[in-house]
Amino acid sequence: MNNKKIFELIFWVLMSVLMFILITGFALTATLFMLIAPVPFMLITRRLGPKMTAIGVLIGVSCIYLLSDPFTSIIYIITFCALGVAFGTISLRAKNGFDYMLFSIAASVFSKIILITVFSQLTGSNPFMIDPEVTNKMISTAANIFSKAGISAPSLSLKDYAKILTDRLSLLMPSMLILFAAMDSLLSYCLASHIVKRLKYEPIVKMPPFGEWRCPQNIFLALLVSLAVDLASRAFPDKRQLVVISANLLEVLRAIFIIQGLSLAWYFMTLRKVHRFFKSTFVIFGIIFSPISYILYIVGIFDICYDLRKLIRRKLK
């Protein structure tokens, strides 16, 4: 065990501990650091091997235990250590970018299910069930802000909206879990790839450029299944399981089609030599602005059906 490896191990473990402290202590940075939480142990696993990784996990968990409590240490083990080791192992064994993303998302979802199970057992509450009181407080705060600006809303409509929002969020929690897993898998990959390139480590398996991303046409089988389940849920409205499966499957497919539409838009803008800043800005607006995301949703479906890139290339010839 040489000094360079010891220094790398200590550096990445301390970086992981610092990120965890920032997540627990600063709400504004929590989401960002949560999405890239696995990166330090992902790099340790790739760079230093299983023995050094085990030592790193022991050091990291000991630091968190000394700074907080056993429950917080469990969260750190699952979200930072275990998931980082999983991402690192997958990145070493994956043959291509698609395999990496598929298995990383599965590992991320599995880790979050374990975390939710542990949380439920220790606290006795279900994280999938959102407390209506919390939603009411959020909406009341928003209503107070609007009232100060001269915009008022009846309290009854706010309560109704709070109930609808609570029910909707509880219903779509599984799909939100999957989409969050996809986000942390992708962002961890991007950050780790950048670090590996800068430090000249062993390169991570490459993913195709965003403009070349294409879903296989058999994705429509999942769409047909979701529509069939949706019809069944309407025929048997008392079966909540059908409603949950249908709503979440449709939400995940909607996200996939929007990403497909964004990929096509990125491809077209690349051909037109649009600056990367403007392409990235369009992607952000396409995700958060509903009218644009709906158009991208339709475009994504057509692109999977007809491969619109071929049509674009033919017209440009």
What residue spans do the PLM features occupy?
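Small-residue-rich helix-loop
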Residues: 199-256, 260
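Long, positively charged, glycine-interspersed low-complexity recognition regions
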Residues: 239-317
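Hydrophobic alpha-helical transmembrane segments
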Residues: 6-14, 54-58, 74, 78, ...
